[in-house]
Amino acid sequence: MIMAGGTGGHVFPGLAVARSMQANGWRIVWLGTRNGMEAALVPQHGFSIELINFSGLRGKKLSSYLLLPWRLAQACWQSFRILRRQQPQVVLGMGGYPALPGGIMAVLLGKPLLIHEQNRIAGLTNKILAKIADRILLAFPGALTSPENKTRVTGNPVRTEIARLPSPEARYAHRTGNLHILVVGGSLGAQVLNTVLPQALSMIPEDQRPYVTHQSGKAHLDALQQAYADHGVTGNLVAFIENMAAHYQDCDLVICRAGALTISELAAAGVASILIPYPYAVDDHQTANARFLSDYQAAVLWPQSELTAASLAQWLMTCSRAQLQSMATHARALAMPEAAQTVAEACQQLSGQTNEA
């Protein structure tokens, strides 16, 4: 059983593990929440899902905290019934709301429990479950403090097509002409990127101006198209990108937020990046994520408070493709492309080598 929900940063790595395990003959059942993206996304990928009622609390009203014991008890009871019915041989918590009650009940029912932490600063669910889990898997060293014999650094599971891209040397070496930039705001878009990018491009002489693919998020596409038009610049403007591997392969530079899965994809693909962490992320974990690349000259960490159109335009005009190739090579050196298979193997080892999860 895989438990994950709430955001793509939990769900997509879980799906990568699920595909790896399914390919080895495992039966996969997912535990998610009714209101999370996993409720629709997991069945679309061909996996069965069981749903409980539970959600996050950070930033909510006092009444939500007062109701927490009741809501957690209800979610634990729902998880208990699902676990009794499904009888998984091993339970993998990938973080997010459903993993807390599911993980607690898995341990009480004597099911082997593994957890996987995607960020450099662990989320609340995994901080709690780390105290009772049989195995702790980490994307980044030091995210959770736990006994060495229980802990293993695996990296973040990413899509196979990204992990199998050609090397940066093969991709960058023969490119000429203006830079190709990929701007990724995530599924909901990043408004600061939608505002700053067209303005910065307008400050670059037309013969030096990069080619841009800009993913805006569905709700912001019309406004982004207007912003590009207002500044007299052009780009390939899209609401959502389905084939990220192809875009990683074709671009010289990615400008994006610093979610854990994004960091792992950039490393696996071997792409240079400017990382602008979301400043209101819980525990500022995106800044910590970004440093995993920037500390090794694999990316530029650019705080949102310091980002201006003029400074970005100047940076883009002075950087060279050779510098970007060097960043991309450093990024690829940090990759752990077999993470999905490594997590799957850890589940199998803990389960006693059966084919039901």
Swiss-Prot record:
Pfam families per the UniProt record, alphabetical: Glyco_tran_28_C, Glyco_transf_28
Binding of UDP-N-acetyl-alpha-D-glucosamine, residues: 7-9, 119, 159, 187, 241, 286
Cellular component, GO, one term: plasma membrane
Protein's GO biological process: carbohydrate metabolic process; cell division; cell wall organization; lipid glycosylation; peptidoglycan biosynthetic process; regulation of cell shape
Pathway note: Cell wall biogenesis; peptidoglycan biosynthesis
GO molecular function, a single term: undecaprenyldiphospho-muramoylpentapeptide beta-N-acetylglucosaminyltransferase activity
Key words, A-Z: Cell cycle, Cell division, Cell inner membrane, Cell membrane, Cell shape, Cell wall biogenesis/degradation, Glycosyltransferase, Membrane, Peptidoglycan synthesis, Transferase
Catalytic activity: di-trans,octa-cis-undecaprenyl diphospho-N-acetyl-alpha-D-muramoyl-L-alanyl-D-glutamyl-meso-2,6-diaminopimeloyl-D-alanyl-D-alanine + UDP-N-acetyl-alpha-D-glucosamine = di-trans,octa-cis-undecaprenyl diphospho-[N-acetyl-alpha-D-glucosaminyl-(1->4)]-N-acetyl-alpha-D-muramoyl-L-alanyl-D-glutamyl-meso-2,6-diaminopimeloyl-D-alanyl-D-alanine + UDP + H(+)
Localization (cell): Cell inner membrane
Membrane topology value: Peripheral membrane protein
Its EC number(s): 2.4.1.227
Enzyme class: transferase
Purpose of the protein: Cell wall formation. Catalyzes the transfer of a GlcNAc subunit on undecaprenyl-pyrophosphoryl-MurNAc-pentapeptide (lipid intermediate I) to form undecaprenyl-pyrophosphoryl-MurNAc-(pentapeptide)GlcNAc (lipid intermediate II).
Family: Belongs to the glycosyltransferase 28 family. MurG subfamily.
Name of the protein this chain belongs to: UDP-N-acetylglucosamine--N-acetylmuramyl-(pentapeptide) pyrophosphoryl-undecaprenol N-acetylglucosamine transferase
Organism expressing this protein natively: Nitrosomonas europaea (strain ATCC 19718 / CIP 103999 / KCTC 2705 / NBRC 14298)
Gene: murG
